[in-house]
């Protein structure tokens, strides 16, 4: 299988070139988790994959608790369905705590102090959903002084411990609520089963991909990623490309569009962030700075061919720019991609 075939299958498996999903929460569960550090762009990542969806549809799913937002992998914010949150946290949180241990120390956040703060937060959230600023004030009233930065790590700790997650937006303000309002704590956890489950979810929705890609996306160690891959059933296949082994779930070719399509990709989309090796969709002819590595991609045929920009206050003005202005591309397809983005944001 060559690079073009890999791109074609990835776009199909990630539900970008085609999909049968109609509900935001169905898509999120299929993907396992969707990076959501850029909140507005994360909502567009859902809209990109489900035709005729609007931002109001995604907001409604979030407000109803069908999708929640929390630190989950690597670590950064992700969209996830509540029922998947606890078993994934049980798998990934210990590794994340180790990775950010130096930050805990930097802000003098001992385990005792963080548990005390989270107990105060948990008690406060029983009554009502609260913003970060409101929670920080309550914690301070109880005698635990923090800075804006240190309190961010307390919130992160609370999310990793399965105590809190996103609640219903209060206007443009993010609020927090108890995860237990959506899903009960785990009564049992078998690590090997969770590894297998996450590997199956990843390679089904993002294959063809390598073990290294899986480890990069999940934040798990290479050892754990390999173990998870060993649990893949015989339904999965593998092949070698440039000396690397790729795993995927074979798909009926009738359901894989031959045309990879043209899309305005959101920042930090799963099509890019899911893979450690990005050479398959990065054109070496075009210099892409680290700042641009996950920003505003104009994707043509599964390759990054340019960038796009829009005015948040005036979506009628969307500008696209090709890295190579002389390159022949389907301008109608670009106009359609712009129209899809604008349609998603119509109120």
Placement of each model-derived feature along the sequence:
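Phosphate-backbone binding and catalysis cores of DNA-processing enzymes
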Residues: 1-133, 138-141, 145-147, 285
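Non-catalytic regulatory appendages
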Residues: 231-284
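Loop-centered beta-sheet repeat module
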Residues: 148-225
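A short, conserved structural fragment
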Residues: 63-72, 76-77, 159-169, 233-241, ...
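Short, hydrophobic-biased segments on the C-terminal half of alpha helices
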Residues: 58-59, 152-156, 226-233
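Positively charged, polyanion-binding regions of nucleic-acid-associated proteins
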Residues: 111-128, 191-207, 229
């Amino acid at each position: 299988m060559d690079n073009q075939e890999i791109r074609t299958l990835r776009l199909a498996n990630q539900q970008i070139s085609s999909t049968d999903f109609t509900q935001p929460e169905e898509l999120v569960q299929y993907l396992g988790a969707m990076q959501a550090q850029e909140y507005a762009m994360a909502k567009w990542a859902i809209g990109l994959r489900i035709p005729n969806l609007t931002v109001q549809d995604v907001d409604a799913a979030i407000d109803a608790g069908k999708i929640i937002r929390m630190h989950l992998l690597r670590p950064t914010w992700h969209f996830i369905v509540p029922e998947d949150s606890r078993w994934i946290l049980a798998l990934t949180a210990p590794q994340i705590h180790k990775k950010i241990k130096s930050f805990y120390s930097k802000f003098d956040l001992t385990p005792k102090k963080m548990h005390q703060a989270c107990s105060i937060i948990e008690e406060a959230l029983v009554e009502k959903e609260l913003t970060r600023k409101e929670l920080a004030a309550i914690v301070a009233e109880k005698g635990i002084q923090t800075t804006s930065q240190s309190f961010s790590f307390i919130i992160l700790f609370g999310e990793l411990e399965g105590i809190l997650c996103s609640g219903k937006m209060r206007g443009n303000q993010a609020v927090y609520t108890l995860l237990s309002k959506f899903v009960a704590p785990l009564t049992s956890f078998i690590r090997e089963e969770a590894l297998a489950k996450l590997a199956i979810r990843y390679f089904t929705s993002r294959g063809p991909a390598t073990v290294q890609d899986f480890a990069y996306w999940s934040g798990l160690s290479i050892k754990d990623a390999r173990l998870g891959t060993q649990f893949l059933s015989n339904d999965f296949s593998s092949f070698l490309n440039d000396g690397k082994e790729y795993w995927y779930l074979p798909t009926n070719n009738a359901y894989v569009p031959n045309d990879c399509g043209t899309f305005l990709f959101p920042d930090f989309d799963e099509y890019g962030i899911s893979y450690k090796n990005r050479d398959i969709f990065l054109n070496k002819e075009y210099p892409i700075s680290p700042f641009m590595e996950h920003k505003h991609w104009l994707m043509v045929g599964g390759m990054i061919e340019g960038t796009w920009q829009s005015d948040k206050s005036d979506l009628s003005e969307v500008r696209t720019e090709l890295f190579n202005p002389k390159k022949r591309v389907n301008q109608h397809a670009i106009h359609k991609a712009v129209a899809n983005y604008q349609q998603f944001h119509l109120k």
